Amino acid sequence: MKLDNETIVHRYGKALFELAEEMKIRNKFHSELQEYKKVLQNEPQLKVFMSSNQISPEAKLKIMEILKKDSSKLMTNLLDMLYDYGRITSLEGIIDEFDRLNDEFEKTVRASVITAIELDEERKQKLASSFANVVGAKKVIIDPIVDPGIIGGVILKSESYIYDGSIKTKIARIKRLLLK
């Protein structure tokens, strides 16, 4: 039975997280995974190269050796296993799953903050602190997004929470009430 990518990503991410925690290298391994994630994001053609049937296995193995250089034993084993099972293109998803589990473990919430204007660091910190209190997190990592279309106010979105305090939404609510 062939597994879909979502199942692969979930299983490998969970196994890696549990193994890294058991080996007491979770934070260090998390940092190492972030370096690989940067490489994958900065070199999108790497995924295409590694999944292409037109590229020889020898060429792919040379790239694998470069990728494994200076890697931890756990990372080297992961890369070898993904390559051997033809799942190397799932690496970024596996890293994302590890990140999700790590955030859950650390009680960290990632949230998009949409505002009409760019926020200074002080306002970002205040929003992060307030949002952390609301959702019961120790830490909130904010991804600021500027959207002049919301007119004013703020929209906060995390995996399990949405707060829309934008002027645009308030105007829409008033409009609906007036049209009733």
Curated annotation (Swiss-Prot):
InterPro entries assigned: ATP_synth_OSCP/delta_N_sf (IPR026015), ATPase_OSCP/dsu (IPR000711)
Coiled coil regions, renumbered to chain: none
Single GO MF descriptor: proton-transporting ATP synthase activity, rotational mechanism
Membrane topology (UniProt): Peripheral membrane protein
UniProt cross-references to HAMAP family, sorted A to Z: ATP_synth_delta_bact (MF_01416)
Record family assignment: Belongs to the ATPase delta chain family.
Protein name: ATP synthase subunit delta
Organism: Ligilactobacillus salivarius (strain UCC118)
Highest classification ranks of the organism: Bacteria, Bacillati, Bacillota, Bacilli, Lactobacillales
